[in-house]
Amino acid sequence: GSTSYIYDTSAGSGTYAYIVDTGIITSHNGFNWAANDIISKSYSNYGTVLDIFAPGTSVLSS
């Protein structure tokens, strides 16, 4: 198949993407590019909740 892609280099400029998920490891070194843009908020009535599977990290990196 073709490996050439043609796209407007300004595509997506000025847009925002919001990811709402559990278990985002905001300190992951793969997110250095977005370190100032990641907002982590817990709405749990039970204090800090640890999501050991961290599926949000995978979602954010996609």
Curated annotation (Swiss-Prot):
InterPro entries: Peptidase_S8_Asp-AS (IPR023827)
UniProt note on regulation of activity: Inhibited by phenylmethanesulfonyl fluoride (PMSF) and chymostatin (CST), but not by Bowman-Birk type trypsin-chymotrypsin inhibitor (BBI).
Enzyme Commission designation: 3.4.21.-
Activity over temperature: Optimum temperature is 40 degrees Celsius.
Biological processes annotated in GO: proteolysis
Up-regulation conditions: By gluten.
Primary localisation category: secreted
Subcellular location per the Swiss-Prot or TrEMBL entry: Secreted
Protein origin, superkingdom: Eukaryota
Name under which the protein is recorded: Alkaline proteinase
Organism: Fusarium culmorum
